[in-house]
Amino acid sequence: MSTYTPPYQLTDAILALSAEIAATVKEITVRGNLSAQPQLHRANRIRSVHSSLAIEHNSLTLDQVTALLNGKRVLAPQQEVWEVQNAFRAYDLLPSLDPYSIDDLLKVHRVMMDGLVMGAGTFRNTGVGVYAGDQLIHAGTPAHYVPEAMQQLFEWLQNTTAHPLVASCVFHYEFEFIHPFADGNGRTGRLWQTLILRKWEPIF
């Protein structure tokens, strides 16, 4: 078993925010089961997909994303339509996914990036970086270390005693730091954080 532990520090502010969020989640849970309110759950899913893809510069509006989920056609670039449709398919997998399974992570990436990139569903075998214009602001973990780094991260997630709110954030940060895929890291990482939180509280 790996002894890897991500470098993070719990501050009073983080603990206070975690307690506040946990209390809010409990209050929502006590008031009513979200799964018994399909319209609210559906609206939340639409907003999640829209906001996640907007970060990736997808230009579709919330109304257009809603229309696509309802099976309607929208006038938009085909790739952006595929991004939305793929994201809905990936989020539909959430109830069946194991947050500690690398195979499930690869499955999600394959669905999320189907038809959008070569090698969807596989870890990258080349270097990758995050750029602001022409400036490199982050270089991902060297490709030959990616499988080992992801294995260590998943082992940590499965064995940590950190609160799920903290663990999900640490996992997401480390996931993006490793940048295991050639593309689609952001949207896949956000979905996986949702999955970790769902394991804690189904309202996510």
Regions found by a protein language model. Name each.
Residues 1-204:
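FIC/Doc superfamily catalytic core
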